């Protein structure tokens, strides 16, 4: 088996592919965080004992 120097260990992705996956993961995390923040804000408003 020959080693491909363009691949990133241990995934086997190229550096460009790994960066693309990372960007999508970060974008998804930001969307999830924004939705969670909004949901917590609504829950705090709707909960009578929190004011």
From Swiss-Prot:
A GO CC term attached to the entry: plasma membrane
Any Pfam family: LHC
Transmembrane segments: 24-46
Positions on the Cytoplasmic side per record topology: 2-23
Periplasmic topology ranges: 47-51
UniProt-annotated location(s): Cell inner membrane
Annotated protein name in UniProt: Light-harvesting protein B-800/850 beta chain
Source organism per UniProt: Rhodovulum sulfidophilum (Rhodobacter sulfidophilus)
